[in-house]
Amino acid sequence: MPRDIIILECTEAKAEGKPTSRYVTTRNKKSLRTPGRLEKIKYNPFLKRRTLHREMR
């Protein structure tokens, strides 16, 4: 199965108008477990806490 490179961007920092943190990862596009956008809890160094990061498109 092919894997695609995706970028995860912080949603909370974007809403607050602060610098957003971004992470680069891969995902399996044909996976039945994650049909929509990928969401993960990752650390944002600008906010100094763990926040929700969503897949950018």
From Swiss-Prot:
Example of a GO cellular component annotation carried by this entry: ribosome
Keyword flag Nucleus: no
UniProt keyword annotations, A-Z: Ribonucleoprotein, Ribosomal protein
Family membership noted in the UniProt record: Belongs to the bacterial ribosomal protein bL33 family.
Record's keyword annotation contains Ribonucleoprotein: yes
SUPFAM superfamilies: Zn-binding ribosomal proteins
MF terms in GO: structural constituent of ribosome
Gene Ontology process terms (BP): translation
Pfam family of the protein (one): Ribosomal_L33
Top-level taxonomic group: Bacteria
Descriptive protein name: Large ribosomal subunit protein bL33
